[in-house]
UniProtKB/Swiss-Prot annotation:
Protein name as it appears in the record: 4-hydroxy-tetrahydrodipicolinate reductase
Matches recorded under CDD domains: DHDPR_N
Family according to the record: Belongs to the DapB family.
Main location as per UniProt: cytoplasm
């Protein structure tokens, strides 16, 4: 039985993970980290705001917190190694570099989306990008009104997949908004547009558009449990891995 430590226990994703762990046969929630004294659906015995106690009480940590909290977790873990599953989005280049640095002494799985469906979508989109080289690529993502980062980490990962498949540097071709007289679309341009509203859990569409035809690939998440179950399975897998930075593809056994 893998002992899971939940970091950022008061968040919506954390609440979903707590619920999913109740039905999990191979893992259990052993401790939860929060600055709050009370967290919904958690007994006070499981709660702590002390890093040392938190790390000691678990085999693997799952983190879906905010980026500042993730940085604090990584900095502590660098001298107290522990397998980490990190799903925090909106990380900048410096924060991603910290991930790489920390993975030198512990196994870290970082993914902007933990669902099997999105992992498959990324694979299919990569293939389509190679084959449909003359097609324009546009990505649209939609989330609930409370999501803080835009475009979503999932959409940016998807954009990275299709750019890499065409041997393009995403930073050189990325467009995240259009307004006014912007001129004609460039050949290599990859656009990522964000919609926000309601309680949409997550919807991502990557379109390949050409004269006379187009293809759109779509993934819709209808419940946060999709991501929670993926994170739990990733944590169970990560427990026995050596130091290094892993992706969700690694945990699913998807080959390049």
């Amino acid at each position: 039985m893998v002992k899971i430590g939940l970091y950022g226990a008061s968040g919506k994703m954390a609440q979903s993970i707590i619920s999913c762990l109740k039905d999990e046969k191979d893992a259990t929630l052993s401790v939860a980290f929060s600055q709050k004294n009370e967290v919904e659906n958690l007994s006070s015995e499981l709660l702590t705001n002390d890093f040392a106690k938190f790390f000691e009480a678990c085999d693997v940590i799952i983190d879906f917190s905010q980026k500042e909290a993730t940085v604090a977790l990584l900095n502590y873990a660098r001298t107290n190694p522990k397998p980490l599953v990190i799903g925090t989005t909106g990380l900048n280049d410096d924060e991603k570099n910290l991930l790489h640095l920390a993975s030198g002494t512990m196994p870290i799985l970082y993914a902007t989306n933990m669902s099997l469906g999105v992992a498959v979508l990324n694979r299919i989109a990569r293939i389509a990008s190679k084959v449909l080289r003359e097609f324009d690529i546009e990505i649209v993502e939609q989330h609930h009104r409370h999501k803080k980062d835009a475009p979503s980490g999932t959409a940016m990962t998807l954009a990275g997949c299709v750019a890499e498949a065409r041997d393009l540097n995403l930073k050189d071709v990325l467009v995240t908004g259009r307004a006014g007289m912007v001129g004609a679309r460039s050949k290599d341009e990859i656009a990522v547009m964000a919609l926000r509203g309601g309680d949409v859990v997550g919807r991502h569409t990557v379109g390949f558009y050409n004269d006379g035809e187009f293809i759109e690939l779509n993934h819709t998440a209808t419940s946060r449990a999709t991501f929670s179950k993926g994170a739990i399975k990733a944590a169970i897998w990560l427990k026995d891995q050596s130091s290094g930075l892993y992706s969700i593809d690694d945990s699913l056994g998807l080959d390049d």
